[in-house]
A protein has these predicted regions:
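Charge-rich amphipathic alpha-helical interaction elements
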Residues: 1-58
């Protein structure tokens, strides 16, 4: 249950990060948005792998 909540929260954060990236103009903020997106994407992939492993072991 906790894992599913983490996945949902991370997906929401990823959606917000994409929205922020599309709206920034300043080059420094663009770089910052890219790093944020990459970080959240890595966490999202990690959580999805964990869910997959948990499902396989059930």
């Amino acid at each position: 249950q906790q894992l599913l909540e983490d996945i949902a929260r991370t997906k929401s954060a990823l959606d917000r990060a994409y929205s922020n990236f599309e709206n920034v103009i300043d080059p420094d903020l663009i770089d910052s948005s890219i790093y944020e997106l990459q970080s959240i994407q890595m966490r999202y992939r990690f959580l999805l792998r964990q869910a997959s492993l948990l499902e396989e072991s059930s």
